[in-house]
Amino acid sequence: MEMRQPAVAGQFYPLHCENLEKELTRCFEGLEIREREVFGAVCPHAGYIYSGKVAAHVYATLPEADTYVLFGPNHTGYGSPVSLSRETWKTPLGTIDVDLELADGFLGSIVDTDELGHTYEHSIEVQLPFLQYRFGRDFKILPICMGMQDKDTAVEVGSLVADLVSESGKRAVIIASSDFTHYETAEHARETDSEVIDAILKLDVPGMYDSLYRRNASVCGYGPIAAMLSASQKLGGSRATLLEYANSGDVSGDMSAVVGYAAIIVE
């Protein structure tokens, strides 16, 4: 069996199972686990020390599902423009299988089966220990890495995912992995991010793209967010909530060049 090995264990999160569990416990500290009818979410993907607590706000609300669809941006430039992994994924907490039944539905579509896009990419990998911590082993994933993030591509991919999920009758939750503004002052990042987040909270994909262009925003996973929004709405999601917003300066103390992080759910 082909295995997608962890690329950033020991960098973005602890390498050893025991330390990783401790770090995840820290991230969830003070949060009540209260499952909500979540169709989709936006989660950050920085090192857990910086964005783990923000991500935990989302994971504390997620319901159990058969499959978690994970959209992540392609930071490496490797692989297909939109790539789907079929390999089993390994983390320090164990292995997770891909939902091959759903994966088969992408044949002949804009989404290619391609492992190279995933081999070194961290954006999806860093979400998986959160899922394992919350739900153990009883779920599958559908990991889709997006190098092409234009609106038409994102909406097409999101719409296709919604159709496949509906036809399957499975319970699925769609997670978009994205950080927000990169390396601006905390004040500037908050201004830019609040405009982009406002559009997301209105479930307004064209409006989000307008904000990105107008503000020249460095949100890395805008395509995954748009794909998640279009899929979530097609599956019945009708309102979005911002659960938490923070930036790297809140941890490092350096407010001169921060990365913004948001936890958003669509119900």
Curated annotation (Swiss-Prot):
InterPro entries per the UniProt record, alphabetical: MEMO1_fam
Pfam families, A to Z: Memo
Highest taxon of the lineage: Archaea
NCBIfam families named among the record's database cross-references: AmmeMemoSam_B, PRK00782.1
HAMAP family assigned: MEMO1
PANTHER family (UniProt xref): PROTEIN MEMO1
UniProt similarity note: Belongs to the MEMO1 family.
Name listed for the protein in its UniProt record: MEMO1 family protein MA_0601
Source species of the chain: Methanosarcina acetivorans (strain ATCC 35395 / DSM 2834 / JCM 12185 / C2A)
